[in-house]
Amino acid sequence: VWREGYAPPLAYPWQEEAVEALRGRSGVLAAPTGSGKTWVAYRWAHLLDASGMPGHPRERVIFTAPIKALSNERYLDLRKMGLDVGIETGDFKKNADAPVLCCTQEIYTLKYAGRRNIRLVVDEFHYIFTDPPRARTYMDGLRLTDPEVPLLMMSATFGEASRVKLYLERVLQRPFVLFESEARITELVFSKEPVSHPADIRNALVFLFSRQGVEEMAEQTALCRERLPREKIDRIRSIGSILGVKKVPHPLLSGVGLYHGSLLPREKLLVETAFRERLLDVVVGTDALALGVNLPAEYVIFAQLASYHDDAPISKNHFLQMAGRAGRKGLYEKGYVTWFDRSPWENRFYDTGEIYAGLLKKPSEPAAIELSPSYGRLLREECTLEAEARMVAQYSLPERDYWEVVREIRSVLRKVGSLSKRLVKPHLRKKYRDILGEVWFDEMELEQNMKIARLFCLQGMPHALSAVRLLEPHERNRLQALLRIKRLANALPRGYGFKGMSVLEKEIHSVDATVFTFEERLREIEESRSF
């Protein structure tokens, strides 16, 4: 039975067509952001029947996502439907034996790949096109998946989707159906007129690519506005209090949220919740906003289109993914996309308006999947250098040059050798290299892995907070270092572990309790609305 207050969504013609095309088969579903792909996935997995009522899945259903926030969101959505659903990420799990499970791709690859009698939905599959280390995790998990397990890959639109279908068929040795749609539930309008002043920004998500830019633009936009009415400010502070946010950022009191990777989870939840309650009407953020987080807005405004990281304009695919956040059925029947004129936050030597005009004319780029070598497997001697290079070359899209991959692997292994000489004494190097292979964690860079391996080599069972101190300089904040060590601890092989994990968990709870209690806090926020 549906939970009280939950109404089954209505289907659109393209969704019914997709369900028919994908019925009983593995498939790739490519459709724009905000088009309603999730409804198709629920039907495909038998979580909904044709009338939109709860279905009866014949197998366990697993949903994977590239980031924890999306697993949390999918879990909460399925809970609202009244389903028995669990969640498992590297640092949190709840009801993980449930018939429906939401997890990160890393957890699927580590724990669930190879199991039978499941249906697998891979959400935001396009994420792997721009992240080689994560692409390897995705493809390792998919290659380990039992051939009888049905797969549904959900993705935003991209160029030459048929190449991805053929790639998956070649790598996974099974047939796939490709269903592409350009349909959107709401109309998307690309404006020819820019926004010229922060005072003109309303009902919008504003994109930039740096924390400093986000903070500056949020402040400037807030300064152009009156403070919110007292009752709205009180409500924002009440939400913040429930989430444990002691000081509400000044821009929120004028209806402007800010969103970037250095925020604590509770700070992100405050912005997301206040925006969905329409207490805020603007969120200024990095492209973290584009990763499926549910923030319905009428406008998407680009205040930057050339990233500092690449020192180049963003891709058409990335542009469309962010633009697709505009519009939401039932709130904004049309979504509008534009740019901020003469943006002072644009990468120097670039003009936002010129890039915007060029992106509108540019075709979508073909999907590219570049796999990274598995140095853990190489160090454990589970494969030869040649076999690993051949796998990486053949299973990338387009295929990489074999000798180029060989040179890349040899270069990294030489670096391992030279760094080992600096990190440990000669009599420990064989032991150290063995440990490095055994505790290697794909989430971490080479030097981070080597420092952690040294800790195990010298201390046997090191204290978790000692490992946190090693990683902290590489992370945006201490919480991220704490959570990474928690995920590493969960992934360590038998015979390895950290002392003081209870101390680490206690510190995580003191820094941000919503890591473990997000569902309870959100329920409390919802209940507090009725008073």
What name fits each language-model region?
Residues G27, F92, R143, P150-L152, ...:
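Conserved interdomain linker/interface between the two RecA-like ATPase lobes of SF2 helicase motors
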Residues P32, S51-T89, D200, L205-V282, ...:
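Conserved C-terminal RecA-like helicase domain
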Residues E148-P150, L295, Y299-I355:
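Conserved segment of the helicase C-terminal RecA-like domain
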Residues Q105-L152:
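SF2 helicase catalytic motif II
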Residues E277, A367-F531:
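Non-catalytic terminal extensions of ATP-dependent helicases
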Residues V1-A30:
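Conserved pre-motif I regulatory segment
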Residues C102, N117-V122, L280-S307, K334-F340:
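A short beta-strand element within the Helicase C-terminal
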Residues N72-A113, E180-I185, F190:
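Inter-Walker segment of RecA-like/P-loop motor cores
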